[in-house]
Design a protein with these regions (language model features):
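PLP-dependent aspartate aminotransferase-fold enzymes
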Residues: 1-105
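Glycine-enriched alpha-helix->loop->beta-strand junction motifs that scaffold or abut catalytic
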Residues: 156-159
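Conserved small/polar residues in nucleotide/adenosyl-binding loops
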Residues: 164-171
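Short glycine/serine/threonine-rich phosphate/pyrophosphate-binding segments
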Residues: 42-47, 119-120, 146-147
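Aromatic/hydrophobic pocket-lining residues that form π-stacking "cages" and hydrophobic walls in ligand
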Residues: 81, 126, 164
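Generic beta-sheet signal
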Residues: 70, 140, 162-163
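Anion (oxyanion) recognition and catalysis
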Residues: 86, 131, 153
């Protein structure tokens, strides 16, 4: 009987990850995918850190440090983002995305798709408004729903995160 060498096992894992990332890109409408974060909440917190690091120079100089989080996000995602934001000096502001006035201190927005109430909101106009204010937009999306819903990448999201089961514990963040 044949026992596979470690390199062949590693190659098989790499191929599985590549196929998984390709499927994630197709579902999210994003050009790149990663598959090594723990859960959606952690991936969302990483998205906040990434968007904070990517602030334009004028936002950095002005001290823009607020991320807007739509109130319909899952509570565990909000809790992890808040915990991770505090040591970085990032403030979390929650509210209704439809009522948000984008002030100069807001550098990014996070949306849930579908939201915690199960509604699949049409965020296109909001994303355009955020981009016009030089804000990045991240979306925490249900990956299975994206087989039927319009992917976040198609309506302009900069980052999409999701909880997926590659091996019962791995998730993905997408840029």
């Amino acid at each position: 009987s044949y026992t596979p060498y470690q390199t062949e096992v590693s190659q098989g894992r790499l191929e599985a990850l590549m196929n998984f990332q390709t499927a994630v890109c197709d579902l999210t409408g994003m050009p790149l995918a990663n598959c090594s974060l723990l859960d959606e909440a952690t991936a969302a917190a990483e998205a906040v850190s990434m968007m904070y690091a990517l602030r334009p120079r004028d936002m950095q100089k002005s001290g823009a440090n607020v991320v807007f989080v739509d109130e319909s996000i899952f509570p565990q995602t909000l809790a992890v983002m808040t915990t991770r934001a505090i040591p970085q000096g990032i403030q979390i502001r929650t509210g209704k995305y439809s009522e948000l006035e984008l002030t100069p201190d807001i550098f990014a927005c996070i949306l849930q798709y579908p939201n915690a109430s199960g509604n699949a909101e049409d965020y296109r106009a909001f994303v355009e408004k955020a981009h016009a204010a030089n804000c990045k937009v991240a979306v925490a999306a249900d990956i299975l729903s994206l087989a039927l819903l319009t992917p976040p990448g198609e309506w302009g999201a900069d980052i999409a995160v999701s909880y997926t089961h590659l091996r019962a514990h791995e998730t993905s963040a997408h840029l």
